[in-house]
């Protein structure tokens, strides 16, 4: 099991850099950052600083999408950052949620996502593509970064199995992750790939404390975030195609205010029960975290990504350094 962090870039860049450096020193191998350019700071200048202030940590957005920026722009950004970082960049990409919704736009389709991933790979490797009828090549690009695809639905998970180096699953529910990986495995088999070589990330917030009530309140915002994707899934799939453990919790959901996206104690999360918090997040004393991580590893998770945005972030890193990470070395 490897460990990563994700930063929400709503804090001073100096603190983002300090947290990233602390995470690397604490045994975290991946440093990710949200990409929602209207709500928060643009991730790419910040990633440049993160790269300049770390030595070995692999870095990237968790996640970008094909529509916010033209794929030639994204490819050029990554090819440049790969040169700056010494080949440490990773592309996390999905259909788009907050970065699209705040503009009144919908997430892109799985077909557009697949075309973007293929173009990204070719461009960052310095190979020519046909871009809307125009031969296009980044002649100076050297080496294509690994691609992680984020998703919940069968189509995108199948796509991840066919073309991705890794899959990003935004929850820490072992049973739901096992369900998701069934589609990843199917896609890999269809493409003649060994699915066991595909990295699997579980991403979720954590709170280490004997005070379970407090811990739950610090992370309750996260299932509300997940609910946006679930509501989208329900609109596109028949009920029997989706597990009730994923869909039933949104039954009493109200509206969602993206201006309070990923915000501790946001009213967006008023409908989220303790049971869902416990399934989707990691809360409680250190041993509860270790046990949940062992269960995640048993279903195939290779990286646990801490959504580091619940307050007291330095303390969370210190607790993981001392009480969690060493158990998985």
Language model regions located:
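Conserved, mostly hydrophobic/aromatic
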Residues: 27, 50, 81, 120, ...
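Alpha-helix-loop-beta-strand connector modules within alpha/beta enzyme cores
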Residues: 44-64, 68, 123, 190, ...
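Acidic (Asp/Glu)-rich catalytic clusters
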Residues: 20-25, 47-58, 78-89, 161, ...
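Hydrophobic faces of well-ordered beta-strands that scaffold small-molecule active sites
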Residues: 3-7, 31-33, 58-62, 89-93, ...
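An alpha-helical appendage that flanks or caps ligand/catalytic pockets
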Residues: 106-136, 177, 183-298
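Glycine-rich, proline-tolerant flexible connector loops at the mouths of alpha/beta enzymes
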Residues: 30-53, 65, 97-100, 171-174, ...
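N-terminal beta1-alpha1-beta2 module of alpha/beta enzyme domains
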Residues: 1-62, 145
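Short, acidic/polar
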Residues: 11-23, 74-77, 149-162, 218-219, ...
């Amino acid at each position: 099991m490897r460990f990563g962090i994700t930063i929400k870039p709503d804090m001073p860049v100096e603190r983002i850099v300090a947290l990233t450096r602390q995470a690397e020193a604490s045994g975290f191998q991946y440093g990710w950052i949200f990409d929602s350019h209207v709500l928060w700071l643009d991730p790419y200048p910040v990633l440049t600083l993160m790269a300049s202030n770390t030595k070995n940590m692999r870095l990237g957005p968790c996640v970008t999408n094909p529509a916010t920026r033209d794929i030639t722009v994204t490819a050029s950004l990554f090819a440049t950052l790969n040169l700056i970082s010494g080949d440490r960049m990773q592309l996390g990409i999905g259909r788009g949620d907050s970065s699209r919704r705040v503009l009144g736009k919908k997430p892109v389709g799985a077909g557009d996502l697949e075309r973007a991933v293929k173009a990204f790979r070719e461009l960052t490797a310095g190979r020519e593509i046909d871009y809307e009828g125009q031969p296009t090549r980044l002649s100076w690009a050297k080496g294509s970064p690994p691609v992680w695809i984020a998703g919940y639905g069968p189509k995108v998970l199948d796509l991840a199995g066919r073309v991705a180096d890794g899959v990003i699953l935004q929850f820490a529910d072992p049973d739901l992750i096992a369900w998701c990986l069934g589609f990843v495995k199917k896609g890999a088999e269809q493409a003649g790939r060994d699915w066991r070589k595909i990295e699997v990330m579980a991403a979720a917030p954590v709170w280490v404390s004997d005070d379970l009530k407090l811990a739950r309140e610090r992370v309750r915002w996260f299932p509300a975030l997940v609910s946006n994707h679930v509501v989208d899934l329900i609109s596109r799939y028949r009920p029997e195609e989706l597990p009730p453990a994923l869909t039933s919790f949104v039954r009493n959901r109200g509206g969602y205010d993206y201006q309070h996206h990923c915000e501790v104690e946001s009213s967006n999360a008023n409908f989220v029960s303790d049971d869902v918090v416990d399934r989707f997040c990691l809360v409680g004393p250190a041993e509860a975290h270790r046990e949940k991580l062992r269960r995640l590893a048993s279903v195939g998770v290779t990286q646990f990504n801490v959504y580091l945005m619940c307050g007291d972030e330095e303390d969370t890193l210190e607790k993981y350094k001392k009480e969690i990470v060493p158990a998985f070395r």
